[in-house]
C-alpha cells in the first residue's frame, strides 16, 4: 500500500519507519529544506528522532509528489499547522485517500478539533489515531496500544489492517469527539504534573492531579458530546498516564521547568519543540467558560502560564476550594 506521511517530526518519522517495516511504500514529506538535506544525506533526523531512516522511505518537499496515488495520507504536523496542510492538500489531492490525523490539539482561533479543521477542506474519511504512544518507543518496537476513531468505521478497519503488527496494537472507537478531546486535554494535566514535580511535590500530589484532571476532562468532554467511557480508555486515562509520568513527555518536561522557576518562554526555548499543552490550555479554558464547565486545574494552569500566577499560589487555590462530592458534575 502506498502511504504518505506529512511531517517529519518525532511522530511522523516514527510512524513512517513503522509502516516501512510492514512493507508499505512510504513517502515522508517535509518542508524544511535544511532538514530535507540532512535526512537525504545522512538518513537521520537528528533534532527530532535520531534513528536510522531506511533508504526505502522516499523523502520529498513536493506535496503533490508525496500524495499522488496514496491510499492513506498521514497528517503528522503540530496542531497549529493542520489547517495550513489541509488547505494545501485540497489543492493537490488526486484521489479519495483516507486521512489519518496524529495531531493532538484544539485550534485556538476556532476551538475546533483537528478532524473538524481537516473536514473544512477535504471530503475524505478522516481517522484519528490517539493514545499513549511516545515516538521514541514506537520506533524501537516497544509494545504499544492506541485507538482509532472515525465517523466511518470501515475507514478505521482499513487503517487498523495497514498499521497493526505484533508491537503496535490498534483498537477502534466510534467516539471521535472523545478520542480527540482525550488526546488534547491530557496535555494540560501533564503540564500540571510537571509543575508539581518542579515544585518538589510527591506521588500523592501527582495522583490527585491526574485523577481530578481526568474528572474535568470528562466534564468538558461530556458537554461537547463525548461518551464518558472513552476517557477510561487508551485515548483518555491511557494517554494521561504516559504523558504525566514520562520524561519523554514534552508537556511534563516543560511543566518541570516552570515549577523550578523558569518563565513559559524560557521553558519552551529549552524544550526546543512544540509543547501542545500550552495552546490547548488556552482553548480548553475558553471552552470551559463558554459551556460553563468547572475546570479548576485548567484554570490554575492557565493563570500560571498566561497571567504570571505563582505555582505555589495556584496549588493553594486548588487545595482550598469549596468542599465537593467526588463525582460532582460528572
From Swiss-Prot:
Instruction: Please list the residues that bind NADPH.
Output: 10-11, 31, 104, 135, 250, 274, 276
Q: What are the protein's UniProt keywords?
A: Cytoplasm, Lipid biosynthesis, Lipid metabolism, NAD, NADP, Nucleotide-binding, Oxidoreductase, Phospholipid biosynthesis, Phospholipid metabolism
Alphabetically, the GO molecular function entries are: glycerol-3-phosphate dehydrogenase [NAD(P)+] activity; NAD binding
Provide the catalytic activity annotation: sn-glycerol 3-phosphate + NAD(+) = dihydroxyacetone phosphate + NADH + H(+); sn-glycerol 3-phosphate + NADP(+) = dihydroxyacetone phosphate + NADPH + H(+)
Q: Which PROSITE patterns match?
A: NAD_G3PDH
Q: What does this protein do?
A: Catalyzes the reduction of the glycolytic intermediate dihydroxyacetone phosphate (DHAP) to sn-glycerol 3-phosphate (G3P), the key precursor for phospholipid synthesis.
Where does the record place the catalytic residues?
A: 186
Family (UniProt): Belongs to the NAD-dependent glycerol-3-phosphate dehydrogenase family.
Q: What is this protein called?
A: Glycerol-3-phosphate dehydrogenase [NAD(P)+]
Tell me the SUPFAM superfamilies matching this sequence. Answer: 6-phosphogluconate dehydrogenase C-terminal domain-like (SSF48179), NAD(P)-binding Rossmann-fold domains (SSF51735)
Primary location recorded for the protein, binned into one broad class: cytoplasm
The highest taxon in the source lineage is: Bacteria
Which PANTHER family does this UniProt record tie to the protein? Answer: GLYCEROL-3-PHOSPHATE DEHYDROGENASE (PTHR11728), GLYCEROL-3-PHOSPHATE DEHYDROGENASE [NAD(+)] 2, CHLOROPLASTIC (PTHR11728:SF1)
What does the record list as GO biological process? carbohydrate metabolic process; glycerol-3-phosphate biosynthetic process; glycerol-3-phosphate catabolic process; glycerophospholipid metabolic process; phospholipid biosynthetic process
The metabolic or biological pathway listed in the UniProt record of this protein is: Membrane lipid metabolism; glycerophospholipid metabolism
A GO term from the CC aspect: cytosol
* Compartments in which it is found: Cytoplasm
Where does this protein hold sn-glycerol 3-phosphate? 104, 131, 133, 186, 239, 249-251
Name the Enzyme Commission number(s) assigned to this protein: 1.1.1.94
Which HAMAP family does the protein's record reference? NAD_Glyc3P_dehydrog (MF_00394)
Amino acid at each position: 500500500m502506498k502511504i504518505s506521511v506529512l511531517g517529519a517530526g518525532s511522530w511522523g518519522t516514527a510512524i513512517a519507519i513503522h509502516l516501512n517495516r510492514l512493507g508499505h511504500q512510504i513517502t515522508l514529506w517535509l518542508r524544511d529544506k535544511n532538514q530535507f538535506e540532512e535526512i537525504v544525506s545522512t538518513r537521520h533526523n537528528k533534532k527530532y528522532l535520531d534513528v536510522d531512516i531506511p533508504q526505502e522511505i522516499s523523502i520529498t518537499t513536493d506535496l503533490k509528489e508525496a500524495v499522488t496515488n496514496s491510499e492513506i495520507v498521514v497528517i503528522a504536523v503540530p496542531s497549529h499547522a493542520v489547517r495550513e496542510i489541509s488547505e494545501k492538500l485540497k489543492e493537490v489531492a488526486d484521489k479519495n485517500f483516507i486521512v489519518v490525523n496524529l495531531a493532538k490539539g484544539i485550534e485556538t482561533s476556532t476551538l475546533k478539533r483537528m478532524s473538524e479543521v481537516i473536514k473544512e477542506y477535504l471530503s475524505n474519511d478522516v481517522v484519528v489515531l490517539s493514545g499513549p504512544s511516545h515516538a521514541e518507543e514506537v520506533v524501537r518496537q516497544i509494545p504499544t496500544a492506541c485507538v482509532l476513531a472515525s465517523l466511518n468505521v470501515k475507514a478505521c478497519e482499513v487503517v487498523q489492517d495497514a498499521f497493526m503488527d505484533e508491537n503496535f496494537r490498534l483498537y477502534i472507537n466510534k467516539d471521535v469527539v472523545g478520542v480527540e478531546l482525550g488526546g488534547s486535554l491530557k496535555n494540560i494535566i501533564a503540564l500540571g504534573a510537571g509543575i508539581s514535580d518542579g515544585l518538589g511535590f510527591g506521588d500523592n500530589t501527582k495522583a490527585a492531579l491526574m485523577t481530578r484532571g481526568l474528572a474535568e476532562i470528562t466534564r468538558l468532554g461530556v458537554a461537547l458530546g463525548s461518551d464518558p467511557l472513552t476517557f477510561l480508555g487508551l485515548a483518555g486515562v491511557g494517554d494521561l498516564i504516559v504523558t504525566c509520568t514520562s520524561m519523554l513527555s514534552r508537556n511534563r518536561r516543560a511543566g518541570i521547568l516552570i515549577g523550578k522557576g523558569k518563565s513559559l518562554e524560557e521553558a519552551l526555548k529549552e524544550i526546543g519543540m512544540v509543547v501542545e499543552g500550552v495552546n490547548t490550555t488556552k482553548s480548553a479554558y475558553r471552552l470551559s467558560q463558554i459551556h460553563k464547565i468547572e475546570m479548576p486545574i485548567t484554570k490554575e494552569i492557565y493563570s500560571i502560564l498566561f497571567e504570571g500566577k505563582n505555582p505555589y499560589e495556584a496549588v493553594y487555590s486548588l487545595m482550598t476550594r469549596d468542599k465537593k462530592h467526588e463525582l460532582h458534575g460528572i
